[in-house]
Amino acid sequence: MKKTLFLLLTLVGFSVQASSVLSMKERSVLIDNILEQRFSDVLPHIMEREGIDMWVLMSREYNEDPVLKTMLPSTWISARRHTMLVIYNPGNGQPLERLAVARYAVGSLFKKAWDKEAQPDQWEALKHIIEARNPSKIAINTSDSFALADGMTSTEHDKFMAVLPEALKSRVVSGERLSIGWLETRSDLEMQYYPVLTQIGHSLIATAFSNEVITPNVTTTDDVVWWLRDQTRALGLTNWFHPTVSIQRQDNEVFDQISAFSKRPGENIIRPGDLIHVDFGITYLRLNTDQQQHAYVLKPGEKDAPASLKEALKSGNQLQDILTGNFKVGRTGNTILSMSRQQAIEQGITPAIYTHPLGFHGHAAGPTIGMWDAQEGVPVQGDYPVFAQTAYSIELNAASFIKEWNKEIRIMLEEDAFFDGQTVTYLDGRQTEFHLIHSDKNQ
């Protein structure tokens, strides 16, 4: 009977999550609609902001520029042969011209602009297209500091510069800020669906951190990790990193930040009195989540987590409020980090802040707001400013002394949020109470 009830509860939870997930065909239509909106509404603004009127991107099959890959139609899994894309802004409010200097049109997004029979040399065809438009600046994806903006290979760069006439070579510039702007800026249509993705992630964590999945003194942390992997795949989604589930408990072990962030936790049996932590992220509609929450395993007879643990969670939430309150357009990641740390310390919090942009990638392009091992700031990536219409993984931890355990623990939180230029809003709320797991069999 108990096994039947467990299966029923699991299936009910699964059906609720699955009802939020579109079929592959429905996803395809939506992804292409999102891309069309991004090209019509998002990209023109960014090109004008950065003063660039032509953007040239290229990829060879299975060696994709990470930016170009986000521009491909839903039915294109990768570039084909040698895909060259030209995006030209003619100005005066006219639509962007999107050309594929390739054997194929790139769906309906990029019009085929190379007739191989008339001009067998693809590079020459690209040169003629550029010359005909005579752009003032030609952006290519090269960057010393932002990996996602450095997608043009050395071979492609050499060939590209070799084919350009001298008059155009001086107009070639790094498309670093253009790439970051494209990757970090979220469209209105994307933001209609991003909360759904974060809700699915929260729902999976809530089930994982319940008696539906965890039986104290039996279930291991690795069992929960693989349950999350299996359920993600069962929903037709993917994980962009392998989840971690770790434990802090009343023992003599001291929290070691280097080990916590550089080593995977070992398999551990979950026991009454444990404080459990999960780090979990999924990918859906080409967007990503990155979430961390905590659960407490009630000891027999307990109805709630110890008071000190609940106060520790409040301290973590307070640190979140301090950080998100310091977001301002034009303010750099390093400035936000410094302000937030100073304010937190003044309020009696021991903070560690390592917040990052979120979107097409889990660790996405945009301003880095600290790293766990760089609380003094991050050169270059941390000097990039915050823009409106951007999403972030609000990731941090706060240390607290737990008197019931006579030791210090870390409340490690991570929630996905959106900055509209004025306010940071969590996409599906945030954790303010522990997930509770019962040890008593009759509960």
Each PLM stretch: what is its role?
Residues 1-4:
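Positively charged n-region of N-terminal signal peptides that target proteins for export
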Residues 19-443:
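Active-site neighborhoods and metal-handling regions in enzymes and metal-associated proteins
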